[in-house]
Swiss-Prot record:
Region span, Disordered: 317-336, 590-609
Residue ranges that the UniProt entry lists as topological domain Cytoplasmic: 958-1069
The organism of origin for this protein: Danio rerio
Gene coding for it: prtgb
GO CC annotations, alphabetized: membrane
Name this polypeptide is given: Protogenin B
InterPro entries on file: FN3_dom (IPR003961), FN3_sf (IPR036116), Ig-like_dom (IPR007110), Ig-like_dom_sf (IPR036179), Ig-like_fold (IPR013783), Ig_I-set (IPR013098), Ig_sub (IPR003599), Ig_sub2 (IPR003598)
Length: 1069
């Protein structure tokens, strides 16, 4: 055994020794000796782009233009040395980036890109502008063309501008500088640009000079045009402008901001202070400072410009590697430059697309599960506007001769929406050396799909992959492993998982076009969430105050399949809307209710709802964009608000009318938010656009399969009693043998009771939630926990607990006699939370009937807490008791209350009344029912009383003047004397009469039959007694007071006899 191991090690050493001497690690199989360079040629001419490659023969060369392979033609010929000749050049056809590709038996490599520029017709992108200056000033004109190179010159008055004076300087970039202008410099200037294809002139700009009287005043130095920040390619010229004026003429000097000396070998001064570098190199990069100083003084001014000479360069190059089958290769490539270079990876001259085994992270290329086909050239291309650079490396895959053959006869069978069974046969060769199998699978559709791997032992030839997404095609292959390496991969098989119910519903967008409609729109679910082909949508809606839900089912159609208009709605009403989604397997859980208030009905024209778009930028911010709908209304601004699902709205953000975008920050990850936007005008707020968005989760550990657990599904709640609800749910399908637990969240559905939320922890998939309030609507949600991770909450379900029979009797039972044979009984609802009463039962009977068990029964609706007991017999004592009932049963009766009904009316006594608390006087709040007979009597009595009052007032006023002298006499027994004295008293005290008579007219209903101090108005019975001192008028029937003493001892309120009328006034406490 030891000799075998030593022999194997010797084989590996020999392989590495041979490879090193063959130049593999030195990389000598293929290279470029000459690469194409940037070139500019006139249209109609020809150009030769050079390219020569070396390596192991045979080596062939081909060319690409803008990434597309070039085919030879009459104008395009491939020369024998690999160069490319292009004749009869045209800008539209031939201008672009060229690249040569060399290949041999080991693979292919590409060169860097060379730009071919065709000089065409020039067009001015900037024209000179007119100037008006004083004599002796500095003039500056500039122009620019759309392409370079171009020769630029200047003309004055359509003649060439003489440049024999050092006052005039023309820069290569098209700038004309004239120092110390004189009258002969006045005129019209224009710019002339020329190349091999055209010659063009700019618009004219006139220079107007203003004469100056007397000597020029002293001026501090001023830089009119300073250096600009510029990026320049290697070996190209660059000019840094510095034009200054002042009196006396300032001196211009240059320096570097980093205090390094300026390279004078390539730099020179152009004109009066402009710095020119003829051929830029990398060390010329830096910040250059122009300084204008007044001679002999310390007065100066400066201007700075940055020169960037940083073409792409590689600071870390990929290295060639040798790896065994099923190993992992990593290539690194880091580049720098300005602008920042973009890195592209190539394999054998073709751009690499990431897939299951090939990934790119931070400009690094990683290849896992290496197969023989990965043996190739790998290149890193760094490119920006200043150029490109390429680095080449090689991956060599070493294979063992004794490796097993690939597994055979791969077969896949679908088990469910998330599981597929794989079966295979052992390798045909060296099957006894297999120690394990590796199953590789990935999604078949799309790009950049991640490849997953499952390793199993060699004792089985089947495996269930149960962590798949529903309704997806998956591709599988298997690799057999032995101690020395891996087999070739097996044939690939593709299998489709079954559909499932959708994982969630789309986000809804709600807008109103009128006060009576709501437009509901949504985006189609992505395949990961739909878990199959969506067949229908179910839209449910109701008002916030009504629990009756209306639903409409919408089959999926090609057109307008993602919106629906709810019509015939109520204006200014809050509607709750939710959605369910269906595949052919079944319906998803409905979404949470989304609220939307329909607009008010108004004759004023307000802005329509804008079109709203929401896009999560990251886990804590969302981009909000809106587009105002076409309207004639002048928009004065926008209002934006947002809030998490289930919470009240935050403050409103007001935005100006020109803003159509806003970013909401500081959000929580994995939370559903409601966003609302409306436009407002002078007529008020417009229609509102409402949409929801879910923030994604923040990035966590990469390559973690369970980055987020799915929530429990199929949550179902059923009321078990008045205080308990049975809750059940399903565990989501995912492959993990780890134990899971669940959290149940429940609480009243009313937002005002949000603080009453409770939680239950359980490891089962069902729980009995107890301790609930009867007849209360509760909401329930469940989440899953596993390995210190938690899923989102499941969709909320709602359930109302059952009714509970009344447990206590009605309270505050009171009985009051309001007529000789009629009593009023009132009560309060039993003191029991959330109690629903359907009806009340009133039992009453006289004592004799009670002993005989003969009760009379009255029933009143649950909203009524009063009843009239009629046809009571005088001289009896009645017993009364009440109970409450609902659909769940009857409650207990209250304590018995007695009511004594007198046989004869008596003087000065109130009617007999009683209650459960033995109170002397009963105040009855609210309305009670009066039958038609009693109401007719009350109306007749009120009419008689009002007639008497009007007659009395008329008599009092008519007798005032004639009865003054008799005002001091006592009241006589005759009716005319009584009326005479009443008129005399009214004459003496007219103000009191007015004050006292008015209250009598305020009572709507007065019992004219007498016998009670109980008044009945539109609100019910009113007790006339009071503990405060007040004035009172009383009208009673009486023949005559016999003497003064009797009048003092009797209560005027109780003097009631038929046949006589007495009008009394007094103060009482």
């Amino acid at each position: 055994m030891g000799s075998v191991r030593w022999k194997t090690h010797q084989q590996w050493l020999i392989i590495f020794w041979i490879l090193s001497f063959s130049g593999v690690f030195g990389f000598s199989e293929l290279w470029f000796s000459i690469e194409p360079q940037d070139v500019s040629v006139s249209a109609g001419q020809h150009v030769v782009l050079d390219c020569q490659a070396g390596g192991e023969s045979p080596v062939s060369v081909r060319w690409r233009e803008n990434g597309v392979q070039i085919q030879e033609s009459e104008c395009v010929r491939l020369l024998s040395n690999g160069s490319l000749c292009v004749s009869n050049l045209t800008q539209q056809r031939d201008e672009g980036y060229y690249q040569c590709v060399a290949n041999n038996q080991y693979g292919a490599i590409i060169s860097h890109r060379a730009r071919l520029t065709i000089t065409g017709v020039l067009v001015f992108s900037a024209h000179p502008v007119p100037l008006e200056l004083r004599l002796g000033s500095v003039a500056r004109f500039s122009c620019a063309v759309n392409r370079s190179p171009a020769d630029i010159s200047w003309e004055i008055n359509q003649r060439s501008l003489p440049q024999d004076s050092d006052r005039i300087t023309v820069l290569p970039n098209g700038v004309l500088q004239i120092r110390n202008v004189t009258m002969r410099d006045a005129g019209k200037y224009r710019c002339v640009a020329a190349n091999a294809a055209s010659r063009v002139t700019s618009r004219e700009a006139e220079l107007v000079l203003i004469p100056v009287g007397g000597p020029r005043r002293l001026l501090k130095p001023l830089i009119i045009a300073g250096p600009q920040n510029i990026s320049v390619a290697l070996h190209q010229p660059v000019v840094l402008e510095c034009l200054a004026e002042g009196n006396p003429r300032p001196l211009v000097s240059w320096s570097r901001a980093d205090s390094k000396p300026i390279d004078v070998s390539a730099a020179s001064v152009l004109g009066n202070g402009n710095l020119m570098i003829s051929a830029v190199k990398a060390h010329h990069s830096g910040t250059y400072v122009c300084r204008a100083t007044t001679p002999g003084t310390r007065n100066y001014t400066t201007a700075a410009g940055n020169v960037t000479v940083l073409p792409p360069s590689l600071v870390e190059k990929p290295e060639s590697q040798t790896r065994p089958r099923a190993g992992t290769a990593r290539f690194s490539c880091q580049a720098e430059g300005t602008p920042t270079p973009q890195i592209t990876w190539f394999k054998n001259g073709e751009v690499i697309r990431t897939n299951g085994r090939t990934k790119m992270y931070n400009n690094k290329l990683v290849i896992t599960q290496i197969i023989p086909e990965d043996d190739a050239f790998y290149q890193c291309l760094a490119e920006n506007s200043q150029g490109s650079v390429v680095s080449t490396s090689r991956l060599i895959v070493v294979q063992s001769e004794n490796r097993p053959s690939a597994p055979r006869n791969i077969h896949a069978e679908t088990i469910s929406s998330s599981a597929i069974l794989l079966a295979w046969e052992r390798p045909q060769y060296n099957a006894d050396k297999v120690i394990a199998y590796s199953i590789h699978y990935m999604k078949s559709e799309g790009l950049n799909n991640e490849e997953y791997q499952a390793v199993i032992g060699n004792d089985t030839t089947s495996h269930i992959v149960d962590d798949l997404e529903p309704a997806r095609n998956y591709t599988f292959y298997i690799v057999a492993y032995m101690a020395m390496g891996a087999s070739r991969m097996s044939e690939q098989v593709t299998r489709h998982t079954l559909e499932d119910v959708p994982l969630r519903t789309p986000e809804l967008s709600l807008t109103s076009r009128s006060p009576t409609d709501i437009l509901v729109s949504w985006q189609p679910l992505p395949p990961k969430l739909s878990r199959g082909r969506v067949s229908a949508y179910r839209l449910s809606y109701r008002t916030a105050t009504d629990e009756q839900v209306n639903s409409v089912e919408l089959p999926v159609s090609g057109e307008n399949g993602t919106q629906y208009l709810l019509q015939d709605l109520q204006p200014d009403t809050i509607y709750l809307i939710r959605m369910s989604v269906s595949t052919r397997v079944g319906w998803s859980q409905p979404s949470a209710w989304s609220s939307h208030r329909t607009p008010k009905t108004s004759s004023a024209t307000v802005p329509p709802a804008p079109n709203l778009e929401l896009e999560p930028l990251n886990c804590t911010s969302v981009s909000v964009r809106w587009f105002p709908a076409a309207s004639d209304v002048l928009i004065q601004g926008f209002k934006l608000s947002f809030h998490p699902d289930g919470q009240s709205e935050d403050s409103i953000t007001q935005l100006p009318p020109q803003d159509h975008q806003h970013t909401i920050t500081a959000l929580n990850p994995r939370v559903k938010y409601h966003v609302k936007v409306l436009a407002f005008s002078a007529n008020g707020d417009g229609y509102q656009a409402h949409q929801t968005v879910n923030t994604p989760g923040c990035p966590s550990t990469p390559n973690r399969r369970l980055a987020a657990l799915p929530p429990p599904d199929h949550t179902h709640a059923k009321a078990n009693s008045s205080s308990a609800v049975h809750l059940s749910w399903g565990r989501p399908a995912f492959s993990s043998g780890k134990p899971v637990t669940f959290s149940v969240r429940y609480g009243p559905a009313s937002p005002s009771e949000a603080s009453s939320v409770r939680y239950i922890q359980t490891s089962e998939q069902t729980v009995m939630v107890t301790g609930l309030q009867p007849n209360t609507r509760y909401e329930f949600a469940v989440r899953l926990h596993m390995d210190q991770m938690s899923s989102p909450w499941s969709a909320t379900v709602y359930q109302r607990t059952l009714l509970e029979a009344p447990m206590s009797p009605p309270e505050s039972v009171k009985v009051t006699l309001i007529e000789a044979d009629t009593a009023l009984v009132c009560w309060k609802q039993p003191n029991q939370p959330n109690l629903s009463v359907t009806h009340y039962t009133v039992l009453y009977a006289s004592q004799s009937s009670w002993l005989a068990g003969e009760w009379q029964v009255l029933q009143r609706e649950g909203t009524n807490t009063m009843a009239l007991l009629e046809k009571l017999e005088s001289g009896n004592v009645y017993l009364v008791k009440i109970s409450a009932s609902n659909l769940a049963g009857d409650g207990p009766f209250s304590n018995t209350v007695e009511l004594a009904v007198k046989g004869k009316p008596h003087h000065g006594k109130n009617p007999r009344h009683a209650d459960s608390h033995a109170e002397k006087t009963a105040f009855i709040d609210g309305l009670y029912h009066i039958d038609e007979k009693s109401m007719s009597g009350i109306i007749v009595g009120v009419c008689i009383a009002l007639s008497c009052i009007i007659l009395c007032i008329f008599i009092l006023l008519s007798k005032t003047q004639t009865q003054k002298s008799a005002s001091s006499k006592m009241i006589g027994s005759m009716r005319n004397e009584v009326m005479h004295n009443e008129a005399s008293s009214a004459n003496q005290q007219p103000a009191e009469n007015a004050e006292v008579l008015l209250p009598m007219m305020r009572n709507h209903f007065i019992d004219a039959k007498g016998g009670s101090n109980l008044l009945i108005n539109h609100a019910g019975p009113i007790n006339c007694g009071s503990q405060t001192k007040r004035k009172r008028w009383s009208i009673f029937n009486h023949s005559q007071r016999s003497n003064e003493s009797k009048n003092e001892t009797e209560d005027p309120a109780c003097l009631y006899e038929v046949g006589k009328t007495v009008l009394c006034y007094e103060d009482e406490a």
